[in-house]
Regions:
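Flexible C-terminal active-site loop/helix
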Residues: 94-99, 103-207
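Catalytic core of soluble alpha/beta enzymes
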Residues: 1-111
């Protein structure tokens, strides 16, 4: 890592990369994060934790080691994300430069991506990783009535093509205006997506 940081500072072949580099995410495996002090390197490059953010005290612990940021992911916990955002804002009042990044973990079309977008917006972030649509084709096997209901309620966020409702990505951006509604970023009520009449037998297996 030391060699990489020095190369970013001195290698002319890396000038364009260095000029565009915002931060280096999770430079070590989660289990090794706490074994290395990055304060000497962090004067020129910002480092953030991602996978190592596995507890409510992870960000403050990482701060001591020179990390300046932490990722926000719904799957890691809404309240943890809010707490870390408050921490960064508090520390920055002292003239420091800590931040939250918006990362993804395959948030699917529907509530998952909508609520994560709302969380990102709450933090005031304009750039976010979105990769769920790379792994699952829109609403995929979701019942057509349900997918259509989401499309009708959030027509700025979704579009329909080739018979499938998908996230509407235009020039690298997605619209979020329709998410500003009561109900945590969803304009639908449970009954709006149609009745669920399928019956499933639940069997208990005792070993």
């Amino acid at each position: 890592l030391d060699t990489l940081v020095k190369a970013l500072q001195t290698d002319t072949a890396l000038e364009a990369l260095a000029a565009r580099l915002l931060y280096i995410e999770q430079p070590f495996a989660r289990e090794n994060t706490w074994n290395f002090d990055l304060r000497s390197l962090a004067t020129t490059v910002a480092f953030i934790i991602d996978e190592a953010d596995d507890s409510y005290d992870a960000f403050p612990r990482a701060k001591i080691l020179g990390y300046r940021g932490v990722s926000s992911k719904s799957c890691k916990g809404l309240y943890k994300s809010l707490l870390n955002g408050a921490r960064a804002a508090c520390w920055n009042k002292a003239g420091e430069d800590f931040f939250i990044s918006a990362e993804d973990l395959t948030c699917q079309a529907g509530l998952a991506v909508q609520q994560d977008n709302a969380l990102v917006a709450f933090h005031g972030l304009k750039h976010a990783e979105r990769n769920g649509h790379h792994y699952v084709d829109g609403f995929a096997n979701t019942p057509a009535l349900e997918a259509g209901s989401f499309l009708a309620a959030h027509s700025d966020l979704y579009e329909k093509s080739d018979g499938i409702v998908r996230l509407a990505v235009r020039d690298g951006t997605i619209a979020t205006e329709s998410l500003a509604v009561p109900g945590f970023a969803c304009a639908l009520q449970p009954g709006d997506i149609g009745p669920h009449n399928e019956k499933h037998d639940i069997k208990e297996h005792v070993t």
